[in-house]
Amino acid sequence: MKYTLAFACSQDGFIAKHSKDNPFEWTSEEDQNHFRTLISENEWQVMGRTTHELNPNHNRKRIVFSRQYKEIELIKKDIPDQFYFNPDLHQMSDFEKICSGNILILGGTSVHDFFIYAELVDTIHITIEPHTFNGGVRAFSYINFKDYKPYFLSKNYSYEEKTLNNNGSILISFNKNS
């Protein structure tokens, strides 16, 4: 099982202007193509409830983190591979009983925090888009944007950077070294 975390952010480090902001409205075509590739490479997606509600898709296998549910349960009875999961009440072994294969972690902040803190993430893809939000939703509650690179390098990740387009979109990838 491989865990990949992916998100886009503004050049000042925010993944959204506010909690209901949909990144598909401001991310580049190149980032959206990269995102579609990641979706095709990963069997399951993990996200918070707000992220799921912004972009529902009944055809994708999803685990939706939500503290509103005491039991692991189907989001909708007629969709067999989408579950609510409360990370405060259930163990990773419960999570891994549901999922098999590669997992794409999509956010938001508390979901990112959960997997980074648990040191489960193998690969991190961050697209930095040439927008400035001057505030909003952070990718991590305890890692500042300017500290991403030193933080992940200190956690034994390698670093790669790639220019995506002429507008200034940059893809940064961190890969966990064995």
Q: What kind of region is each of these model predictions?
A:
Residues 1-178:
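Enzymes that bind and transform nitrogen-containing heteroaromatic metabolites
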